[in-house]
Amino acid sequence: MPHYRSRTSTHGRNMAGARALWRATGMKDGDFGKPIIAVVNSFTQFVPGHVHLKDLGALVASQIEAAGGVAKEFNTIAVDDGIAMGHGGMLYSLPSRELIADSVEYMVNAHCADAMVCISNCDKITPGMLMAAMRLNIPVVFVSGGPMEAGKVVSPTDGKVIKLDLVDAMIKAADPNVSDAEAEQVERSACPTCGSCSGMFTANSMNCLTEAIGLALPGNGTIVATHAWRRGLFEQAGRLVVDLCRRYYEQDDASVLPRSIATKAAFENAMSLDVAMGGSTNTVLHLLAAAQEAGVDFTMADIDRISRKVPCLCKAAPATDKYHIEDVHRAGGILGILGELGRANLLDLSCGNVHSGTLGQAIAQWDVAGGAGEAAQTFYRAAPGGVPTTVAFSQDKTFLTLDLDRKAGCIRSKEHAYSQDGGLAVLYGNLAEKGCIVKTAGVDESQWVFTGRARVFESQEDAVEGILGDKVEAGDVVIIRYEGPKGGPGMQEMLYPTSYLKSKGLGKTCALFTDGRFSGGSSGLVIGHASPEAAEGGAIGLVEDGDVIEIDIPKRRMHLAVDDAELARRRAAMDARGDKAWQPLDRERVVSLALQAYAALATSADRGAVRDLSQIKR
């Protein structure tokens, strides 16, 4: 029978000092026999996805204590990728994932907590906490802050409501044909409420995937942050984690532990969902990283295999301007997509979860198109309120009807899929021997096979300058290199270059290839995560202006049309540069000691950009 971890610091005469300190936090005699549960919050006033979380830790804590536990809250850091985008701040985004994972481990292990409720929301916070949960392997429930409502403006031409998000503001601002007044209206309307950005961007993708893995409650990824019914997820999480504690520590039920739930089959289910919903390409990095922390052998080869058999069943911004996450919720949310995947025999329904036994049981209870009961039918009618606010649970609007149209609605059946090819794909070739990632859900089918000439940039900044300076033309393949985990360092997101290609009218006539990564808001023929990266000797570092690049998504091919002898000559010339080899020639970039430490241990994207501690020389 496992022992409560907290009793290390709460029991025995030799822990008198620790108990004295616990008493100073408010604990009483009767509390020392209860489970101590960490409420892992991530409130910050810097991030709209987290600005409303301040009081939600206390809400969860109240339910933990009502259920017989002791709640102790702490915060992690949280970086807003949108605010950090387009300048040196983006170098810190991906490395912050490792800091978050480490900080959760440090706090939970230092204080011998028995379990956790992880209150996350945005891009690196959910994966960082997920990595920590896999390391610690103690009972955990994830509950996120929820998605932002989509922005809305009325079209001056036809009076119809147009849905907006952050990316629209960026594209309009960079388009010289858009007036200052129109650009300002879009900017003021694009992000109306608290919550994670309203499309199928990285934050929402990850919060949806925690549902599929089995560590979050139904609705976690899709019910908007402002809706009153989201409060119930936080309250239920607080009560549920105490029950999970008792099952593990008092009944020796290890099935409730994260590593028991997040098996290889669960990661494959999550990836199947990701491919079906066209999730952010960043999710590939984060699932690979979490799987490594869990000790699960889940690799790019598994992702490639899944991407070849799972169709695209759901589209939301940026893949379409018709639907945002609030519309995915109305169509049945993540359990609705999982229900369609289940009917197509594309899931392992025996996988467990924290709330409903098995995935199959969860689908039976919550899949609104599969006969779920009145509670589910009501829950998925939760709608946006349409009032700008930073306050959680501040409105209770509902849709009049659900979107159950599986032929032409937001979520579709396999028979009526947006495409039988999935929403994400892994490409291989001499430009990416270990793979690269494209979000096919966001690529116009006319570009699935594309040949163009390389236009090479040694940094994101140079690429932005080149695009805005009209140095990129239709038919070009923009190459942005030395932006990988090690070469950046930090693997910057390329949202500005992809947005500016659209602003210049090149969104459907150019491609972009990088060893960096993309915001979930990027769309178009944009291919990232080139592995190995340029700084690790990847062939992307050998591309020259004018080289022919061949892209074939159906054949999963990424090819540099240069013969092997010429590539060998270029590689030898690069190696001959000695200490300057595999580095950008003329890039001015200040790299702090903290980022240098990350770069020294960072792996390429095919391994999730995790740190490789074997690189430490003793």
UniProtKB/Swiss-Prot annotation:
Modified residues (N6-carboxylysine): K124
Catalytic activity annotation: (2R)-2,3-dihydroxy-3-methylbutanoate = 3-methyl-2-oxobutanoate + H2O; (2R,3R)-2,3-dihydroxy-3-methylpentanoate = (S)-3-methyl-2-oxopentanoate + H2O
Subunit-level organization: Homodimer.
Keyword Membrane: no
Alphabetized PROSITE patterns for the sequence: ILVD_EDD_1, ILVD_EDD_2
Species whose genome carries this gene: Bordetella avium (strain 197N)
Physiological role: Functions in the biosynthesis of branched-chain amino acids. Catalyzes the dehydration of (2R,3R)-2,3-dihydroxy-3-methylpentanoate (2,3-dihydroxy-3-methylvalerate) into 2-oxo-3-methylpentanoate (2-oxo-3-methylvalerate) and of (2R)-2,3-dihydroxy-3-methylbutanoate (2,3-dihydroxyisovalerate) into 2-oxo-3-methylbutanoate (2-oxoisovalerate), the penultimate precursor to L-isoleucine and L-valine, respectively.
Protein name: Dihydroxy-acid dehydratase
UniProt pathway: Amino-acid biosynthesis; L-isoleucine biosynthesis; L-isoleucine from 2-oxobutanoate: step 3/4; Amino-acid biosynthesis; L-valine biosynthesis; L-valine from pyruvate: step 3/4
GO biological process: isoleucine biosynthetic process; L-valine biosynthetic process
Record gene name: ilvD
